[in-house]
């Protein structure tokens, strides 16, 4: 008995320990199962101790399995809400960890309790088993005692549960304290935000300082411009230069037109020739194929032809007589050819191109004829097989002989008649073809006779062939005559083959007849054809050589003439530059006169040479003379360059330079002698060639004499040029003296001289390159001389051929007549060309004056060019002769333009010295007079040089032998110079590339520094955020300690959230997809940004490659110039084109460079303005950037100075204003040609600026978010205070305050999550918080808005009118802002910069506003979702209030019916606390539950579905109205007149609104006694609901009226169906809006849950509205008035349409200027910010109204007044709001209001739906207005030109990329945090897994131990069984009970162990399931985040790939 009592006491102690542990588990710090226990406690009255304990344990053990899976969805839902807020995520995760630990401990305790319970039962059973035999009654008493003790324990447990309830109340107090701490935390957050605002203000101040700095820079630029404008003389010279340059351009254009004409004629003739060649080739191929088939027959025919040749030799005697006659005729023809040569030399351009084309064609024709003759010879070898074809061959040969003669004469005489000749030839060929056909028919009919006739025809052909061949040469009386005639025959045949090939294709069918038997005739034919073949071959070779020589000579003449013209132009330019260096007008005029005299001398010499050029050799002489003239002119220019260059050198170096100049003069004289010797040699060779070319050597002798006379004239001219050279050198000496005198004044230029010395070194390298080019030109001249020699030899051969052509004298006479006519034409052309040359000389003289003034402006650069020219002259004197200088003059002239382009880049160092040089112009004026005196001395020196040249002429014979050696030396020098030129080019290219690389590196370094500083700033901001978050986390950790006490309430909240979890799961999936889309879009944006960076790098590299290619192009141009001398006729056209293009390109390049400089300035200013926001944080980077920019600016200033030298300085601003479009078009050229790297740098800088702007905007938005966060926190503080006050007022809710606090905490967590999400998405944050504020404020504002729904409709209509007025006002403000911007522009560059900056910024702002609108729509959807969640929480609060008012004291069923009525959600499953979602509420006396049957969740869901459908339809209608906007905007002009009427109507409506507000106030005054009538609140609420149903009916009527208005709008849309083309543009917007609507619908489910939770709190507020029943009639009256107002709103819809048309008229005015549109968009953006600010203030007021409503009736009145004021402020804000997002926000706010009022009155919901429709209509109107603004902006941007559009688009794209990059960075940071959180969760889960594994290991070890014990027990059992058996055998009766008892104990112990193992395994499995679910949830979140990142990346990439011109919707 004592053992039983001891066991029972031990069992009681164990039970007490278990109960204590259960209390610690249940009522301890975790407190998770209080409600469950509490629910179960009521059933414990009649149960036994064990049963109650088992039930408690079972309930606590069965529930962990449910929370574990429920925890995961809850956790998953929280994680799904993580994109809205991540601030409380860690806290929640820690709470969940604590819950998991508490559950684990609870499970362990439950297992232990079960074990203890089982042991207790076993002990009781054992005790009963032991004592049942002895003390059954004592055992019963003990069991009774134990039961009593258990009951006492149960009662104590119930007392503890009561204590737990009290603890729950204390927890409510803890919630309050927690809220106070949260408020403190919010205050700290607000302080931190204030600090951030201070930081943002500091950033703004820094930006202002940066703007001041930029203004200082602008002022510095202005001062620089003032310094540049100080030179008034320079401006005048610029004007004069512009005029003269225009004249020169006109002259150049005239010349270029002439050259184009000549070139076009030549190209056309070449094309025709090529076509004919192609035809001839085809014919030749056909002939080859045909005659190859007849080769065998020709072999047979050849034997017969031999006989024909013998007969042909007899004909030679007759042909010799004809040859004598032809000799005389040939003499006459040679004279005519000489006259023709004179005419050709005079024509030069036009005639030469035609003659060259003709000669080329003749050469090609002859070559082809010769090839055809060869083919014919091959065919003649097969004449044995062509017996049938012999008659056709005869006819063909005879026809071709005549045609050849005609074609030769036509080609030589008249190129213009070649087409006619070809036609005649084609006619003849056709005739021959017809003859062939006829003969073919005759041969088919008469074969035998045909063979005989064939032999006779062959004999006749041979005879005729020999006759033609005899005429080849008088000296060759044998086979050559027939050969030449045959060649002549075949030569005429060339044009004919295309027409005869078909006939020939049929000729093989005639080759079947037998051979003729007349062998003598055949032998004669064979011999004649053989001789003819030899003659044809000889004549063909000679004629080809002669034609090639003629073509090459003429090509050389044309090329040299083109080069001469280019050199003349360049010489004139250089002369102008030389004259400008002195800048003395009188001296410049003298120089111009001298240059003109030189030009006239050149023209006179050319005229003398044209008279002397009686033969083609004289053309070469004239070319050489002209080249000498050009060389002399170039030498003069070089001497002038030497003068100006010497003017810049130090006085110390002048003596050495003078000595070097003397040495150079001697070397130059030697070179002149060498050249003279070479020229004499060439003249001798030419004379010899002419003597060979003329029949009687005496003709060539006379021509030699004439050439000698021309040479003497050229030498005389050269002597004069030598004298001028000496004179210029004397002038140089005088300039040196004057410069030595002025050296004291030039001390200030020492630094500039050092820089110029560096430039000199560079120019020397360039000089080496130019000398190489000169040597190449010299080599080309030598080649030309050799070609001339070949030409002379070929002419000799041509004379022989001409002698052979005497046989065709009759035909030649006819051709001669045509030739004489052509000679007349050529003479006329020659005279015309001479006139053109005279005009060219006049134009060149005019260019002298023009370029003199131009060179005065660019004095500094001219001096550098002169220095380079002087050095080049020195090198030219040392290494080359006059011929080399002549060829190099063209190269130098060409490179001078290239050097000018390069010097533009080098002009940075020259710009400062330019002004000093300009100050020295007066001094140079005086020196100019000295130079004039020195020029006289130079004239004397020139005369002395003429004497010396006379002596040199005597040494010509001796120097001719040295010419060959000199040529070799020259070739070596040319090679060396070419190497030096290549080396200099490589060095220059390397230097240029180094400069480019240096600039690129500097830019990249600046970019990297800016990026680093930007990253540092972002890191600082992120660090601040992280610090803030760390502080928040610290405070959260502090709060988590108190939250641990609230975990029991959390468990209750989890039970309450069970109804929300299904919706949360669906929302989780939708938001997961959204987040995955965001992630994908962000990744795409990152990929796009990386691609953009790579593209920009590639662009920079490509631009570097372009620069390198530019240098390579220069080298290739040199190679092309070398090839021009070798490419003959093609080179002439190319040279002419190049000269022409260079002449035009020089001016265009100057203008383009000018535009480039201005554009670069503007771009620099744009960069400086855009960097204003960065300059505090990026001062170092700015200094580096300014260094690079200063260097680039110096280049730009240098380029601008060079361009200003070619532009009008005084008219620069006006010209630039007029040429805005030209500048834009020039920017494209400049970008592709000059500033590609600069643009790349500027793009990078712009990106930096955009990043900084985005950073500033982010900072601003952060400040705004902080302010909004403060407001949210303030509103939350007020809401919490109001909740506390409401709790104090309603003491019956104390038992449910804990849950209310938990729901508020959940709401706060969601709001915090929303805030975190707002930080992650920049645009969405402000709208989200505003809507959160609005949602929170609307919780209390809806209490008074039931009667204000009517006024809201009126306010909406007034808002539309206010929006119209706001738009008009914003338009006016935009105009004013544009005017101010235009007035504030200081110069054209700044204005252009401002315009572009404003374009880009306003485009960004517009896109940002549109993006904000979209973001606001998205955030509105989110706010609506959160609002619905808040409403769900209000439902829970309302149920709590109902239970607090007495429902909880009646029964559990009613206590749960109230929340079912208040917060039942059709989408959620009922919670354990909500038993009947459709049960009726209790009596009003017990509870003020306002949940009538009309608040059925299903009805609510149906209403919500209807509302969502209506919302979709309204949005569709809004989309349709968007299309109408574009049409209605056109009617805005007409609606201007109706706007006043609408305003009056608005006033009336405002009066009605005031009346309704007065009624509202009266209603509020009547609400004063509502607080004393709490018992009537439920009935009043029911009456209000009936009232709401009535209002719903009225709202249906209003909806129908609105549908009528919408039908009217659709009718108006049909009227403007022409504008529906813009629907395609709106499709994307519609899709986005649909997506937003889908997202909003998905979130609406979530917000519905929140809304139902908040309906409980709203129910409390409804308790104070008991007297609303008395005002039902007033509401009915107001509903009627609302219907009338809706009818009025239909009229107002028309007025709105008119207003939209007026707005379109106002917007039409905006088209007048682009700035107006930009300022409009800016004002709209400002209005958006103002409206958001006003909305936030309105929300604050609404919060105050909430507080006032919760306190007392007086506070309600104050709250009503504040609400009125808030509504007025809201109306003002709505008037100011013009953006789509704010209107959507307002509409969605109204939607939120309607959703919150749904539980109160369904009628109000319909009214608010009607209001929503109206708001959507207003939104559609606003969208149309915004769309119209966008369209107007696009139109204005299109007017700015293609460049500005491209720039704006690129800037918009860049800004989009930057914004997307920033957004991506933020998203990436958030995602990283999320991923870090997920990783931490994974780590926690891993740790849990490890812990569980450890526990499982421990349990396994325990299990193994238990198994071992079991095994031991089994062994003991077996042992005991054995003992029992033994005992049974020995002593059966006494041992049996003990063995049975032991066996029973062992079995019980085994069962207990097994049950413990099973329970342990179950627990472990439950934990593992929970862990797996948690891990799977985390993995799903990770995958969702990754998917969203990918989607965000795709979206960003898609947004980047959109057309830049497309505005963002």
Swiss-Prot record:
UniProt GO MF annotations: actin binding; kinesin binding; structural constituent of cytoskeleton; structural molecule activity
Modified residues (Phosphoserine): 1453, 1463, 1469, 1476, 1479, 1483, 1489, 1568
Compositional bias annotation for Low complexity: 577-586
PTM statement from Swiss-Prot or TrEMBL: Phosphorylated by NEK2 which may regulate its association with centrosomes.
Entries under InterPro entries matching the protein: Rootletin-like_CC (IPR055167)
Pro residues compositional bias, start-end: 1479-1494
Key words, A-Z: Cell cycle, Cell projection, Cilium, Cilium biogenesis/degradation, Coiled coil, Cytoplasm, Cytoskeleton, Phosphoprotein
GO biological process annotation, one example: protein localization to organelle
Sequence segments annotated as region (Disordered): 462-519, 575-594, 636-665, 1180-1225, 1448-1501, 1957-2009
Tissue: Highest expression detected in photoreceptor cells of retina. Expressed at lower levels in brain, trachea and kidney. Detected in all major ciliated epithelia. During embryonic development, enriched along the apical domains of neuroepithelium in brain ventricular zone, in primordia of retinal pigment epithelia and in neural retina.
UniProt feature, compositional bias: Basic and acidic residues: 656-665
Residues with Phosphotyrosine modification: 1475
GO cellular component: 9+2 motile cilium; actin cytoskeleton; centriole; centrosome; ciliary basal body; ciliary rootlet; cytosol; glial cell projection
Sections of the chain in a coiled coil: 74-265, 346-438, 550-1058, 1091-1439, 1498-1697, 1744-1998
Subcellular location: Cytoplasm, Cytoskeleton, Microtubule organizing center, Centrosome, Centriole; Cytoplasm, Cytoskeleton, Cilium basal body; Cytoplasm, Cytoskeleton, Microtubule organizing center, Centrosome
Disruption phenotype: Mice have no ciliary rootlets in ciliated cells.
Secretion signal span: none
Gene3D superfamilies named in the record: 1.10.287.1490
Composition skew (Polar residues), residue ranges: 463-484
UniProt xrefs under PANTHER family: CENTROSOMAL PROTEIN 2, CENTROSOME-ASSOCIATED PROTEIN CEP250 ISOFORM X1
Protein family: Belongs to the rootletin family.
Function text: Major structural component of the ciliary rootlet, a cytoskeletal-like structure in ciliated cells which originates from the basal body at the proximal end of a cilium and extends proximally toward the cell nucleus. Furthermore, is required for the correct positioning of the cilium basal body relative to the cell nucleus, to allow for ciliogenesis. Contributes to centrosome cohesion before mitosis.
Descriptive protein name: Rootletin
Species: Mus musculus (Mouse)
